[in-house]
UniProtKB/Swiss-Prot annotation:
Source organism (scientific name): Acinetobacter baylyi (strain ATCC 33305 / BD413 / ADP1)
Localization, UniProt: Cell inner membrane
Cellular compartments per GO CC: ATP-binding cassette (ABC) transporter complex
CDD domains associated with the record: ABC_CysA_sulfate_importer (cd03296)
Main location: membrane
Name used for this protein in its record: Sulfate/thiosulfate import ATP-binding protein CysA
Keywords: ATP-binding, Cell inner membrane, Cell membrane, Membrane, Nucleotide-binding, Sulfate transport, Translocase, Transport
GO molecular function (one): ABC-type sulfate transporter activity
Pfam families linked to this entry: ABC_tran, TOBE_3
PROSITE patterns: ABC_TRANSPORTER_1 (PS00211), ABC_TRANSPORTER_2 (PS50893), CYSA (PS51237)
Amino acid sequence: MSIQVKNIEKHFGAFHALKNISLDFPEGQLVALLGPSGCGKTTLLRIIAGLESADEGKILLEGADATNIHVRERQVGFVFQHYALFRHMSVFDNIAFGLRVRPRSTRPSEAEIKKRVTRLLDLVQLGFLADRYPSQLSGGQRQRIALARALAVEPRVLLLDEPFGALDAKVRKELRRWLRTLHDELHITSIFVTHDQEEALEVADQIIVMNKGNVEQIGSPREVYEKPATPFVFDFLGQANRFDGQYHENKVELGEDQIILPNVSEVPHGKVIAFARPDELHIHAQPQDNTIQATFLREVWIAGKVVAELQDRNGRLIEIALSPDEARLHLFRPNQTVWISVSQLHLFADHVA
């Protein structure tokens, strides 16, 4: 089912939560609403579900106006961050619940319910837990059961609000892979809310980056990461070193340092915001042309990766990615003067300045 959001406005008192939001969610895609807390992503999801009403605008489901249709009639499956399973019911009964409370005219027979629940338990790979209770399950297992319960009523769209936010890092990673595989099998239109950039980049077909009630960028994971449209998107997606400076005639002046770049025609001369990923910067023990002078602070070893922390002459903290071999080869010392070269510098006009 395709979903269209047209000119949605939402206020909570004086707080403007959503500002004229218009979006298309293609049928069969897994779309991430990505942004920091308070950006409006969960509010938008709840409006699509029918759990919240908009001040202005429309929600179209399969081209039909669903703005004033009750949540029960939208055929939406919803999965929350906190599993919301019924503690007094078995896993089987939790999944069957939505089917058993239907009006008699649309309620399946018990034989059909058993068949459907068994199929869903197999789908989420937890058939052996059918007779257990939520308190006997791990967090990851509970979330799979919550997803199976949402799918039991055969929704036309699946909405997930930070579905893995309450789980530890390893379980989150496992469930991300599982969700992507499950979606490829079912091809149900799905929207999930997350503030986790890695989660969105790994799972989604399309990412909608939100900030302060606005949409900053829409694109594939590769597009939003490699070609961020705004400084916010660049800074929010992945690690980034930010520099504020002046751009003029192929030179970026960064306080006491300057970097010469190839012609950057799309950026006007004047104040700019410049970004470089940690793997786009390189450390040198000896002075080099076209470099930034800095002081080496320390190395941080994380899961086979090395991050060098430095401070430039303007007091900015800079992070540079090193391979373990590079770190062992150079053996930089705290407070050592080093020089930083830049393989790529991404410039944005500083409209605020």
